[in-house]
From Swiss-Prot:
Heme c binds at C35. Binds 2 heme b groups non-covalently with two histidine residues as axial ligands. Binds one heme group covalently by a single cysteine link with no axial amino acid ligand. This heme was named heme ci. It comes from Drimys granadensis. It comes from the Eukaryota. Gene3D superfamilies: Cytochrome Bc1 Complex, Chain C. CDD domains: Cytochrome_b_N (cd00284). Heme b 1 binds at H100, H202. SUPFAM superfamilies: Transmembrane di-heme cytochromes. This is Cytochrome b6. The gene is petB. InterPro entries: Cyt_b/b6_N (IPR005797), Cyt_B6_PetB (IPR023530), Cytb/b6-like_sf (IPR027387), Cytochrome_b_N_euk/bac (IPR048259), Di-haem_cyt_TM (IPR016174).
Length: 215
């Protein structure tokens, strides 16, 4: 085993990378509230894992979506647990994200030289809210249907471009199969990909600039 490690160490300098990660200076004023971003990340990883598991059973069609969710909850092995964890972790992710934004704002973490860190964080917050909106529609129940109908109907009040925006969001004039397909694609592919990209920008900037000072 040591020979295998030595082979990788010679080529990749794994130990130097590990030392750099573990030896980062942590300011003395850091407290539990500085962990809110990390908790949000943990919730996101839980969402990815449980969401991926449910894709094996979920069917994104208006005729089968609700029945497939029922199957997950009542017949699939540990399906009720996986969906429950996904649901509660989603709520926790939103809550931790909101608290994290407040903590950063109140401690001045958005000020120079951390403006770009703040901007990427705001984008991640918007993406998190978008996860909630798109995911809410997937069970295709009454609550999800009317929530999506109301949310996608909001742009209709905008002059000139309102109606085209509504049709763009729904895929048609009304909430139907096109809407479910679009929201499923957004929820399972587009939003996770964008979130991963902005996280890969957000974290290195935190690593480079460090944590903002105390109040």
């Amino acid at each position: 085993m040591s020979k295998v490690y030595d082979w990788f160490e010679e080529r990749l300098e794994i130990q130097a990378i590990a030392d750099d990660i573990t030896s980062k200076y942590v300011p003395p004023h850091v407290n539990i509230f500085h962990c809110l971003g990390g908790i949000t990340l943990t919730c996101f990883l839980v969402q990815v894992a449980t969401g991926f598991a449910m894709t094996f059973y979920y069917r994104p069609t208006v005729t089968e979506a609700f029945a497939s969710v029922q199957y997950i909850m009542t017949e699939a092995n540990f399906g009720w647990l996986i969906r429950s964890v996904h649901r509660w972790s989603a709520s926790m992710m939103v809550l931790m994200m909101i608290l994290h934004v407040f903590r950063v704002y109140l401690t001045g973490g958005f000020k120079k030289p951390r403006e770009l860190t703040w901007v990427t964080g705001v984008v991640l917050a918007v993406l998190t809210a978008s996860f909630g909106v798109t995911g809410y529609s997937l069970p295709r129940d009454q609550i999800g249907y009317w929530a999506v109908k109301i949310v996608t109907g909001v742009p209709d009040a905008i002059p000139v471009i309102g109606s085209p925006l509504v049709e763009l969001l729904r895929g048609s004039a009304s909430v139907g199969q096109s809407t479910l397909t679009r929201f499923y694609s957004l929820h399972t592919f587009v939003l996770p990909l964008l979130t991963a990209v902005f996280m890969l920008m957000h974290f290195p900037m935190i690593r480079k600039q460090g944590i903002s000072g105390p109040l």
